[in-house]
Amino acid sequence: MGGFLVLNSSNNVVRTVPSKKRKHPEYKSKIRELISGIRSDNLREAVRLPQGVDINEWFAMNTVDFFNQISLLYATLEEFCTQTTCPVMNAGRYEYRWADGTTITKPKTVSAPKYVEYLIDWVETEIDNEAIFPKNPGEPFPPNFEDFVKRILRKLFRVYAHIYYSHFHEIVALNEQAHLNTCFKHFLLFVSEFQLVDKEKEMAPIKSLVETMLDQ
């Protein structure tokens, strides 16, 4: 998925579906392009529901946007996050097992790169499903759309937790920490604004970082 999400002049949501090709030499410039429109001093205002915009549309466009961001950020770490270096998807003592409720119903232990591979394929399938993410303006969202969004965002948070816990030194070496921090703060403010990720249960592995970012 490589698109960007905006409100046009009529305050209608423009949603784009990303490309499945994540490995590309321009990923760093793509990250900078993605981040360029996000100013750290206006993130709290940026996550609020704009007047006249349907909340499900707002959830949909931001979910796709956050997925784009974490996909690009993780792409910078693929040479460091391997089956050997990260045989279990975790954030410290917290292990994240994979299940999608459809093809894999029983949570299973997987490596971090395998977890992210499963996640990307699963999210793309969800977003491509027009019964969940309708593509045309005015088409109704399913009554339980917020539940789909919560599931996606909860799993995206786990990738952030793994990156911060296991790969922050590589992020610093790549000089990408400002981009990572801006994306993560944007994500945190959004999920906190609409209570989409359980702070006590899901955010415990990096609780102090979460609290610091939300207090800034």
Curated annotation (Swiss-Prot):
Pfam families: Mob1_phocein (PF03637). GO terms for molecular function: metal ion binding. It is found in: Nucleus. Its main location: nucleus. GO terms for cellular component: nucleus. It comes from the Eukaryota. Keywords: Metal-binding, Nucleus, Zinc. InterPro entries: MOB_kinase_act_fam, MOB_kinase_act_sf. Zn(2+) binds at C81, C86, H162, H167. The keyword Secreted does not apply. Belongs to the MOB1/phocein family. This is MOB kinase activator-like 2A. The gene is MOB2A.
